[in-house]
Amino acid sequence: MVLAVAMSQDADPSGPEQPDRDACVMPGVQGPSVPQGQQGMQPLPPPPPPQPQASLPQIIQNAAKLLDKSPFSVNNQNPLLTSPASVQLAQIQAQLTLHRLKMAQTAVTNNTAAATVLNQVLSKVAMSQPLFNQLRHPSVLGTAHGPTGVSQHAASVPSAHFPSTAIAFSPPSQTGGPGPSVSLPSQPPNAMVVHTFSGVVPQTPAQPAVILSLGKAGPTPATTGFYDYGKANSGQAYGSETEGQPGFLPASASATASGSMTYEGHYSHTGQDGQPAFSKDFYGPNAQGPHIAGGFPADQTGSMKGDVGGLLQGTNSQWERPPGFSGQNKPDITAGPSLWAPPASQPYELYDPEEPTSDRAPPAFGSRLNNSKQGFGCSCRRTKEGQAVLSVRPLQGHQLNDFRGLAPLHLPHICSICDKKVFDLKDWELHVKGKLHAQKCLLFSESAGLRSIRASGEGTLSASANSTAVYNPTGNEDYTSNLGTSYAAIPTRAFAQSNPVFPSASSGTSFAAQRKGAGRVVHICNLPEGSCTENDVINLGLPFGKVTNYILMKSTNQAFLEMAYTEAAQAMVQYYQEKPAIINGEKLLIRMSTRYKELQLKKPGKNVAAIIQDIHSQRERDMLREADRYGPERPRSRSPMSRSLSPRSHSPPGPSRADWGNGRDSYAWRDEDRETVPRRENGEDKRDRLDVWAHDRKHYPRQLDKAELDERLEGGRGYREKYLKSGSPGPLHSVSGYKGREDGYHRKEPKAKLDKYPKQQPDVPGRSRRKEEARLREPRHPHPEDSGKAEDLEPKITRAPDGTKSKQSEKSKTKRADRDQEGADDKKESQLAENEAGAEEQEGMVGIQQEGTESCDPENTRTKKGQDCDSGSEPEGDNWYPTNMEELVTVDEVGEEDFIMEPDLPELEEIVPIDQKDKTLPKICTCVTATLGLDLAKDFTKQGETLGNGDAELSLKLPGQVPSTSASCPNDTDLEMPGLNLDAERKPAESETGLSLEVSNCYEKEARGEEDSDVSLAPAVQQMSSPQPADERARQSSPFLDDCKARGSPEDGSHEASPLEGKASPPTESDLQSQACRENPRYMEVKSLNVRSPEFTEAELKEPLSLPSWEPEVFSELSIPLGVEFVVPRTGFYCKLCGLFYTSEEAAKVSHCRSTVHYRNLQKYLSQLAEEGLKETEGTDSPSPERGGIGPHLERKKL
């Protein structure tokens, strides 16, 4: 409105300060008008076509007066000298503006320049001039902005905005009130025409948001830029009036009550000099070229180049940099720039030195302020040509380069699209690939169609449907509206910088579109539970182009496909939206990933190319696999990776086949593989072909018995592998491991058949020894008994996390079933052996004794083993998948991280245990110990449940566990820890702790052996590749333990004691132990559990989280500090679990809490707690001993 002109720069002597003031004022203006919340109020003077309060000549006269530096001497019947009500309104608006600014400040925290500007604005707006000088005349405001066109706008605009409430405007009719006074008076300080919150300005229809800096001819060019045409009303007005005035929408007083420019409509903002006089034509598409670009007079042109020009070319001036403009002020501010941006029809020759676009230098503002494309929220203020032209305005050469992501010729370089400064080519590449740049480019490209040029880098859209405020946070998020809010964010450079945040805020919808278009990642949901493989997922994308990466998240039935090109991804999504993809009869939900633009995490194992090759060679492989599959030699790789990576084409026949097969998937695969039908065909057919179990598994995974379910799941495999296992227990570790487990389940049901094997095994001393060894190793992994209990718990635990992961649970169940079966077989074998000949068992015991603690463990573990096997297998099964998941952790919006985390850790555990099992006892690493601990913990928990029945059994299990744990503790730390625990427990009861002592001795011995065998860890690692023997051994040991269980727990502790004696203590100790067991087997068990439970129970509790072997990975990769509550501030920061001091909280809670030591201690602690809970539930007295054990254990840990 004329007011803006009135605000002439001359009026404000502090022209040089204008820029800051602009920034300040603009927010103020925006804020007040909108916040008033009085959008209802503000409309009070519905922006009638700004009827010149005075005739145009009068307006011009007013402008002249303003130029004469007569700030308040505007001839207009200036409502600035307002009634008390107007003043109040202005005050309210000012307050609202402050709030808005504060909010804006929070949004611009990432933009230093923007933050600075906001701070300045806040300081000034905060009543730097009481109440914006509330009645400060536009001229005053104008003066302030005089020097810098843009700044000027900011200063005077605010007033206009506030007045919009009637203050600035002459009575209601003054809406845009051509009157120079417009609303400037009310918001002197905030008077930033640039409405930081376009929403604000738009709300007040009558606000003459932008007029402020028009006042001065020379300097104001930018001023005009500040019209609040962004106001909703204004925008609309523009829509009608601004057809021709893309640049000066604000001027369009008619729609813009604020008319923003004091001139009514666009016409006649002749301000002084007519420079502000962006006559209607000026703005109109016809806007006359004479009105130098942006409708400023020629001299304005010069100034515009400097100031407004800066706006136009965001690059030179801060405009370019401050994407914020378009973001925050975009709506209103944008309007200002919009003013500059001439309508399409008229390429105002506002020559921008940097943007020598002859057709639209001014459009630089409107269309996108070139560099500061945000600056000029060129959003087409209106759908009309003007807007269209603005938005369509071709990018400058340098802008096109930036738009296309071409490397800049000179560095540092400021991205003209995002206003982001880049210092080297690497940064440039990152920026070009980044979300901000992609979104801004998208906005820009959309703006041409929408008539809204992407004004800000973030997400502001140039044009807001309601009004100028493309960005309006409040309400005009509709970029698409034609409203002529082709606000160029130019108006306030300062804001431009600060606005970047806002743009994103306001451009919710736009952003979504941007995101959609910007990324190459397709998010696939609702995958069929057990039957979908990597090949299936990749096949979905192959028809549309090259698939460069993928992530299959089986736990959450989701997948991410990264296509080579965005267009390919978009085409894929569009196609599948029209024709949903179906896998195994289930429709998939396929959409663009709103979270990822590309998948940076690579999956371990085969790469996408390999998978694709697999897909192409699927049939051949299937043909070959049928033979291999059924062959006993077919080893199943235990590594989770191969499976997850190459599910169907999946690994090469034997070895590469991953353990994934243990789950339904494997069955599905088998069936699919058996039939050379393409995968997708296999989809539903697959199901039909699949064992009936596939359906059962899928539909009733939890309802089925473990054995039953596992049997069903692994039916084919189980039997095949069973034969394989019996045939080749050692060679194919992974195969034997899984097969053994499967066999175990199968054997369990056909116990007679299974018994045969068990009997045979026990009958052979060599075998029994092997089994014992395996058991020892496996117990270290998971103590059989403990495992058994853990198994029960695990199913619950894993199922809880798995919840939807029925397949994982099934896998684990299958594995457990296999192990259980093995365990059952072993138990049967052991029992048979016992029944057939106690001597044989004794031999086993002797072998165990020879093994040292290992023997004890195996015995105990036998009983535990059946359970443990299940638990072990379950964790393994679950863990397998999770391992990949962890690496895959590129979680989309779905919140899969939780699921991923749990699966990953268990999977990790599984992996480690396999390796560990392969290792000899001495070779077993701390990882093994940890895994054993976890398994034991689970076992303990389960045992705890069963302990109520057999104290002796517990004692047996516990001692076995303890020794196994000691055996599995290769590190001195582990050894010491167990020793400490044992000692602590011995103290409470020496007699009862005989077992503990024995255990500790065994522990130490085994640990030492392990330590000694650290050298042999490398071989152990090699062995890791063949986990099957370990599994077999573990299973064997578990049967042995089962025997012990059968004998010791039911019969008496003496029996148990004898194994223990044989293991690691003199007969006297064993006697003591046996006595202790008899007297208080639970107590002894508790003690042993306490000693070992800290490690195991913790492990158990944390097993789902991570196994020791994974601890380093978990901490480094997942960066999950655990047990932070144990770090307490002392002189420094002290960890109560580990007894370590740290000077900084970060070191203690972040670094230390992710350390292996802390993690182990936490596991032990949690295991103790778990034991206590179990025993308390059982009603045993063990809690007290456990507590005693825990205390000393922790204390020693502290020590």
Curated annotation (Swiss-Prot):
Zinc finger (Matrin-type): 1133-1164
Biased composition (Polar residues): 962-971, 1067-1077
Gene null: resulting phenotype: Mice were born in normal Mendelian ratios, are viable, and do not exhibit any visible phenotype. They however develop cardiomyopathy and display splicing defects in genes related to calcium handling such as CAMK2D or RYR2.
Biased composition regions of type Basic and acidic residues, renumbered to the chain: 626-636, 667-685, 739-758, 770-831, 859-868, 1042-1055
Effect of F560A: Strongly reduced pre-mRNA-binding
SUPFAM superfamilies referenced in this protein's UniProt entry, alphabetically: RNA-binding domain, RBD
Tissue: Predominantly expressed in striated muscle, with highest expression in the heart. In differentiating myoblasts, expression correlates with sarcomere assembly: expression peaks when alpha-actinin is localized mainly in mature Z bodies within the nascent myofiber and expression declines as the sarcomeres continue to mature. Also expressed in kidney.
Listed Low complexity bias regions: 25-42, 170-183, 638-649
Gene Ontology, cellular component aspect: cytoplasmic ribonucleoprotein granule; nucleus
Annotated segments matching region RS: 630-649
Zinc finger (U1-type): 410-444
SMART domains listed in its UniProt record: RRM, ZnF_U1
Outcome reported for the amino acid change (mutating S639G): Knockin mice show severe cardiac phenotypes, characterized by dilated cardiomyopathy, leading to premature death. Decreased localization to the nucleus associated with an increased localization to cytoplasmic ribonucleoprotein granules
Subcellular location field: Nucleus; Cytoplasm, Cytoplasmic ribonucleoprotein granule
GO biological process: heart formation; negative regulation of mRNA splicing, via spliceosome; positive regulation of RNA splicing; regulation of alternative mRNA splicing, via spliceosome; spliceosome-depend formation of circular RNA
Residues recorded with modification Phosphoserine: 637, 639, 642, 644, 651, 728, 787, 871, 873, 955, 991, 1026, 1038, 1049, 1054, 1058, 1070, 1088, 1093, 1182, 1184
Keyword Cytoplasm found: yes
Triggers of expression: During early embryonic cardiogenesis.
One Gene Ontology MF term: RNA binding
Residue ranges, compositional bias (Pro residues): 43-52
Function field: RNA-binding protein that acts as a regulator of mRNA splicing of a subset of genes encoding key structural proteins involved in cardiac development, such as TTN (Titin), CACNA1C, CAMK2D or PDLIM5/ENH. Acts as a repressor of mRNA splicing: specifically binds the 5'UCUU-3' motif that is predominantly found within intronic sequences of pre-mRNAs, leading to the exclusion of specific exons in target transcripts. RBM20-mediated exon skipping is hormone-dependent and is essential for TTN isoform transition in both cardiac and skeletal muscles.
Subunit structure: Associates with components of the U1 and U2 U1 small nuclear ribonucleoprotein complexes.
Protein name: RNA-binding protein 20
Lineage: Eukaryota, Metazoa, Chordata, Craniata, Vertebrata
